[in-house]
UniProtKB/Swiss-Prot annotation:
Similarity comment text for this entry: Belongs to the cytochrome P450 family.
Species whose genome carries this gene: Thymus vulgaris (Thyme)
GO biological-process terms attached to the record: terpenoid biosynthetic process
Presence of keyword Membrane: yes
Name of the molecule in the record: Cytochrome P450 71D179
Record's subcellular location: Membrane
Keyword Membrane appears in the UniProt entry: yes
Length: 496
């Protein structure tokens, strides 16, 4: 009995302390913070983020409380931005104040203690690695030079689909494999031997790292940190990734060159690592973190966008016919198809824009406000976590007519770009932290999609109609399809 009473006293004392701390933190906030829903003691608004994808649930909050709204996630005061004006102020006008990233348990473990580029803090390391990325690795010139790799892998994919003519195929699986091979040849200089292992590692780690952890939301609690079992699973996943990358990097050191003796991404990073003029030394973990960036952001997002575009086109046969007519007329008689040819395909590029609007590869962009700032009249305290809801902005009826409808023709009237200038459409972000692999990612979307539309007439499996296509998203950093896309390829015969 005495033991039971002691436990009750301890629990009541701990809860009382946490409630007092909660009130103390709330009292320190400025008066003019963004509005938000009524919150519960201790957990804040966590109860409002159950039973759906975060971008969907947060959209519901901003629709009710305004495009700039605060959410209390445990101990963490966070602000959601869901309008073009708010995004413009945070990513352009006040960009230095919002250029930092917050990290959580998943990103810290899987992205090598933020020594990569995606989750790096806004510091000299980030500036240096971004400069290397933009000038040495993924510049538009280098992206064009990778054209022969895209052509090789697409030729293999086309042969595979031709051999399966008239039969249902798992398009999701085959496109993921192809994009993975393209990325690995660019990054490593050759195709990865255990490609399926790498794909599974990336997909599973992205799934595990993308959710909310109680230990992240209550950072002052050593007990929750100790009991965060997903953290231990992530460390095991990290060990598997380390083992894979260490082995491959060692092979690369011995080989010393990529395909045909050319310099690949790892060669460039090793060269920079030996450069004594580097302001911040590049570590082995930094190299592995960058490679993981390339695969996690380059493979999953490009494949997901191709699949969303195909899914939408299958739901709208008239759009599919228009896209195929343009591709087949423009590419008729050409043996090599790459960026030069694809850049002339206006409607195809509108299809890609529309797929990115409805299904952005990064539905929410995380930022950290490093000093007190004012956004659309509201005060954002320093160290506030910022969530820019790109998915919600892309479906806002204030900016888009029939926002939930797939309509590539809308860009004939308002030709918005996707490189961070038009804040109605920012699938790759904007400002200093815009995705440095933007051109590489677009090339790996537009070129494969053009070839798939050129070579095949796509049909649904027997018994399915356009209304039966499952468009459900699943949890993940890239907003992928929940279920694989199964289609039937029919070889296009230009003379028939």
């Amino acid at each position: 009995m005495d033991i039971s009473i002691s436990w009750v006293v301890i629990i009541v004392s701990v809860l009382s302390y946490l409630i007092l701390m909660d009130k103390w933190r709330a009292a320190k906030l400025p008066k003019n913070i963004p509005p938000g829903p009524p919150k519960l003691p201790l957990i804040g608004h966590l109860h409002l983020l159950r039973g759906g994808l975060p971008q969907h649930l947060l959209r519901g909050i901003t629709q009710k409380y305004g495009p700039v709204a605060h959410v209390q996630l445990g101990e963490l005061f966070s602000v959601v931005l869901s309008s073009t004006e708010a995004a413009r102020q945070a990513m352009k006008v006040l960009d230095p104040n919002f250029a930092d990233r917050f990290v959580n348990i998943g990103s810290r473990i899987m992205w090598y203690d933020s020594e990569d580029i995606i989750f790096s803090r806004y510091n000299d390391h980030w500036r240096q690695i971004r400069k290397i990325c933009v000038s040495e690795l993924l510049s538009p010139k280098n992206v064009r030079s990778f054209g022969y790799i895209r052509q090789d892998e697409m030729a293999s994919l086309i042969r595979l689909f031709e051999s399966s003519e008239g039969k249902p195929v798992n398009v999701s699986e085959e496109i993921s494999k192809t994009v993975c091979t393209i990325v690995s040849r660019v990054a490593f200089g050759s195709a990865v031997k255990d490609q399926s292992l790498l794909l599974n590692l990336v997909k599973e780690s992205l799934r595990m790292a993308s959710g909310f952890e109680l230990a992240d939301l209550f950072p002052s609690s050593w007990l929750l940190n100790l009991l965060c079992f997903n953290k231990y699973r992530l460390w095991r996943m990290r060990a598997r990734l380390d083992n894979f990358l260490d082995g491959f990097l060692e092979e690369h050191r011995v080989k010393k060159s990529g395909e045909f003796g050319g310099e690949d991404i790892i060669d460039v990073l090793y060269r920079m690592q030996k450069d004594s003029q580097m302001k911040v030394p590049i570590t082995n973990n930094g190299i592995k973190g960058f490679i993981y960036d390339v695969f996690s952001a380059g493979t999953d997002t490009s494949a997901a966008t191709i699949l969303w575009a195909l899914s939408e086109l299958m739901r709208y046969p008239e759009k599919m016919a228009k896209a195929q007519a343009e591709v087949r007329e423009s590419l008729k008689g050409k043996t090599n198809v790459d960026l030069t040819e694809v850049h002339e395909l206006k409607y195809l590029r509108s299809v890609v824009k529309e797929a990115l609007r409805l299904h952005p590869p990064f539905p929410m962009i995380p930022r950290l406000c490093v000093q007190e700032s004012e956004v659309t009249g509201y005060t954002i305290p320093a160290n506030t976590r910022i969530l820019i809801n790109v998915w919600s902005i892309g479906r806002d009826p204030l900016y888009w007519e029939d926002p939930d409808t797939f309509n590539p023709d809308r860009y004939d009237e308002v030709p918005r770009d996707i490189i961070g200038n038009d804040f109605e459409l920012i699938p790759f972000g904007s400002g200093r932290r815009i995705c440095p692999g933007l051109h590489f990612g677009l090339a790996n979307i537009e070129v494969p999609l053009a070839q798939l539309l050129y070579h095949f007439d796509w049909k649904l499996p027997p018994g399915m109609t356009a209304a039966d296509i499952d468009m459900t998203e699943k949890t993940g950093l890239s907003g992928p399809r929940k279920n694989p896309l199964i289609l039937v390829p029919i070889i296009h015969n230009p003379t028939s």
